């Protein structure tokens, strides 16, 4: 395989080949095929598809999240993405930047939750010197659990006017990064609408809690490799290192290589990981039947295999 062939395969899978997604059915099918994607391209570039690129059908002059407000295409793509959130066909995670959502397909989300989410999701977080949550984040969680789904604007009103939007954004980010809460809708008049994840998607959370880290990581590694076609192992470890220890990624890759579920492929002189292709079973073509015709005996000739009858005149002697 050459670099050009690899890039072409990715463009087709990531819908950058002039075939944009415009309907909710197309958007759902795209996300299920790739597993996960960013909403907008990231700088420095990250080897993962983007929803805006699939919506436009090209990677030419795609807007970043900082410039999305000036691009009418971004508003249309966001509207389609929010419909996926409402239908629970996609879930949004705060993996890289709160303004650039990481979208995860419904089928892949339980595995992602097993790596990132809380194992006891209904237990309210507590503030403290050793806690990962601020006091404001704990207050916001209790409010969302009590009154959610609830908009950020409404939250500020209930928590008190002294709470600024930047401070509230930070608190929501703390909860979101651990998948305590999730963005479920967006209203132009009120902004983002939030709910606790265990109530919004109870089945997905329950399944994720029941998965082991190794099982979840193995499934996501396979899905990611299917998405990118082939990737150098170092780049694979960098990507997954954003949400799990790289040593665990390396161990999972070695286990998949030992099981021959992954293998190496040479791409323009570089050694890359890929999902091991299925062996093509060659079935030999059946031999044509040889039809043999039975010859009719000539007149007066005896058929083959029959002995001539004895003359009764001689047998009586």
Q: Can you describe what each PLM-predicted range is?
A:
Residues 1-317:
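Long, low-complexity intrinsically disordered regions
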């Amino acid at each position: 395989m050459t670099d050009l062939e690899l890039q072409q395969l990715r463009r087709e899978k990531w819908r950058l080949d002039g075939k944009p997604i415009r309907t909710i059915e197309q958007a759902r099918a795209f996300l299920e095929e790739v597993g996960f994607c960013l909403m907008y391209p990231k700088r420095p570039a990250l080897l993962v598809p983007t929803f805006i690129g699939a919506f436009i059908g090209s990677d030419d002059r795609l807007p970043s999240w900082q410039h999305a407000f000036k691009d009418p295409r971004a508003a249309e793509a966001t509207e389609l993405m929010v419909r996926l959130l409402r239908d629970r066909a996609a879930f949004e995670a705060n993996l890289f930047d709160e303004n650039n959502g990481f979208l995860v397909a419904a089928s892949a989300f339980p595995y992602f939750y097993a790596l990132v989410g809380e194992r006891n999701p209904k237990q309210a977080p507590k503030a403290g010197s050793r806690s990962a949550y601020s006091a404001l984040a704990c207050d916001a969680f209790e409010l969302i659990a009590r009154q959610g789904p609830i908009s950020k604007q409404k939250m500020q009103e209930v928590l008190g006017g002294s709470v600024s939007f930047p401070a509230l954004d930070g608190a929501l980010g703390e909860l979101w990064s651990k998948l305590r809460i999730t963005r479920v809708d967006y209203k132009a008049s009120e902004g983002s609408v939030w709910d606790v994840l265990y109530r919004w998607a109870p089945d997905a959370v329950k399944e994720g809690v029941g998965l082991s880290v190794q099982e979840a990581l193995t499934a996501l590694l396979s899905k990611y490799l299917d998405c990118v076609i082939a990737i150098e192992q170092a780049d694979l470890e960098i990507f997954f290192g954003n949400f799990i220890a790289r040593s665990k990624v390396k161990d999972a890759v070695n286990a998949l290589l030992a099981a021959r579920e992954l293998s190496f492929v040479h791409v323009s002189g570089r050694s890359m990981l890929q999902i091991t292709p299925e062996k093509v079973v060659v079935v030999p073509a059946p031999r044509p039947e040889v039809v043999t015709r039975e010859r009719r005996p000539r007149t007066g000739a005896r058929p083959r295999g029959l002995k001539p009858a004895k003359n009764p005149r001689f047998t009586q002697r």
